[in-house]
Curated annotation (Swiss-Prot):
GO terms for molecular function: 4-hydroxy-tetrahydrodipicolinate reductase; NAD binding; NADP binding; oxidoreductase activity, acting on CH or CH2 groups, NAD or NADP as acceptor. Its EC number is 1.17.1.8. NAD(+) binds at G7, C8, L9, G10, R11, M12, G96, T97, T98, S117, C118, N119, M120. GO terms for cellular component: cytoplasm. InterPro entries: DapB_C (IPR022663), DapB_N (IPR000846), DapB_N_CS (IPR022664), DHDPR_bac (IPR023940), NAD(P)-bd_dom_sf (IPR036291). The lineage of its organism: Bacteria, Pseudomonadati, Pseudomonadota, Alphaproteobacteria, Rickettsiales. It catalyses: (S)-2,3,4,5-tetrahydrodipicolinate + NAD(+) + H2O = (2S,4S)-4-hydroxy-2,3,4,5-tetrahydrodipicolinate + NADH + H(+); (S)-2,3,4,5-tetrahydrodipicolinate + NADP(+) + H2O = (2S,4S)-4-hydroxy-2,3,4,5-tetrahydrodipicolinate + NADPH + H(+). This is 4-hydroxy-tetrahydrodipicolinate reductase. It is found in: Cytoplasm. The keyword Nucleotide-binding does not apply.
Amino acid sequence: MKIGIVGCLGRMGRIIVQEVVGTGGVELSGGVVRRGNGLVGEDMGAVLGCGHGAKITDSKEFLFDCSDVVIDFSSPECMLECVGIASEKRVPLVSGTTGVDERDFRTHAEKVPLLWSCNMSLGVTLLLELVKMAAAGFRGYDVEIRELHHRAKKDAPSGTSLMLGKAVAQGMGVELESQQHTFGSGCRRSGAVGFSVARGGGVIGDHAVMFLGDDEIVELQHRAIDRRVFARGAIKAACWLVGKPAGLYTMSDVLRA
C-alpha cells in the first residue's frame, strides 16, 4: 500500500515518514511541501535519513495520483485543498489537521472515504468513549477539562479538548454550547462544562477531564509522551480506510474495527 504525506517536512510529517518506512506492508509514495521549497525533487528518505525512493513534490495532484491513501498534517487552508483533490481523484484521505470543522468534510465525504480527527492517538480515542460513559453516570456533576501543551501551540482550547467537551455533552444528552462555562462570567451553574488551558515548555499534550461532585472528584487523564503515538495512529487509520465506502470516519471507527 502506497501512502503519501502532505506536510512531509513538518514536525508531525517527519515522524510519519519515519514510521511509514518502519512499518511492514506499506511504503512511501511521496511527500508534499509548499511551493518554492528548495527541496522539491529531492529524495524524501535521503533528506530525512530513512530510506530512498520517494520524491518531495509541491504538487498535491501528483501526490494523490501516485498514492493509495494520503495522510495530511498541514494547515487548514492546505487541508481544504487536499479534501477537494481527494474527492476529485477518489483517493482516501486521513487528516489530523486542527483548526477546521467537520462541516468542511461533509460534502466531499459523499464521494470518497475521509477520516478526520484532532487527535490520532488510540488512547485519546478510548478516553472519549470513557468520558461519554462517565458523563452519563455523573449527571449534575460539574465538569472541568484541563489541557497543557507546548508554548508554540496556537489554538486554545485544543481540538482534543473540544472533542472531550463534545463527548461530555453527548453523555449528558445536551449541546456543549448550552452547558459551557466561560471563565469570568460569574458563578458557575451546576453541571457546567469548563475549559482550563495552559501553555509552556515542550509538553506534547496532556488532557484531563474532571467530574466534580460535592463529595467526590473523578478524573480521567491522557498524557502523550512521544509524538510517534499520533503517527502510528494515523498510519493505522490510513490502512483501515482503504477500501471503505465513501463517508466521513473518525478514530472511533478504527478503534471499534
